[in-house]
C-alpha cells in the first residue's frame, strides 16, 4: 500500500514538472515572436490622376465626435489626415484653369463591442470582442469654366474588421490602422471608377 502511495506521488510530481516545463517553454516561445507594428500609410503607392484644373481645394467639414464609439480624436494620423494625404498625392491639377474641390463630410473611426456567447463551449473559444469600422463620405466637384464643363463624384467608402478578446493593445492598434487603410483603398477605387464617367476631367 505504501509502495502504491509513493508511486502515485511520483507520478503527480512528474506531471507537475511536465506542466511547468511546458508553460515555461510556451512563455519563451511567445516572448520571442516579433511584434507587428501598425502599417504605415504611403500615398506614393497610389497612381496619380492628372486633373484638368488649375488648383485643388480640400474642405474638411467633418467635426469628429469626442465620445464613444468614435475614437478618431485619439488617433495619429487621423482618418481625415489620411484622406488629405491621399488627395494631395493622387489628385494632381495640371490644367490652366478650373478647380477641383474635395469636400469631406465624414471621416470616422469607431469601435463597438460585439455580443458574446455565454455557453460553456464559448469559454474555450477566442471570441471576437469588438468591431472596428472606418467610414468616408465626401464629394468631389470639378468646375471648368472653359467649355462650361463640370462634374460631381459622390464618395461613400467604408471598411471594417473584428478584434478577438485575446488581442494585445498592439494587435488592436494594427487592426485600427489596417481598417483605415482599407477604407482609403475603397475610396481610391471609387474615385478612379467614377472619374472615367466625367469626360475631360482626367488628362492623359
Residue ranges and their predicted role:
Residues 98-152:
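Surface-exposed short loop/turn segments
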Residues 54-66, 145-172:
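Short acidic, glycine/tyrosine-flanked loop/strand segments centered on an H-E-D-like triad
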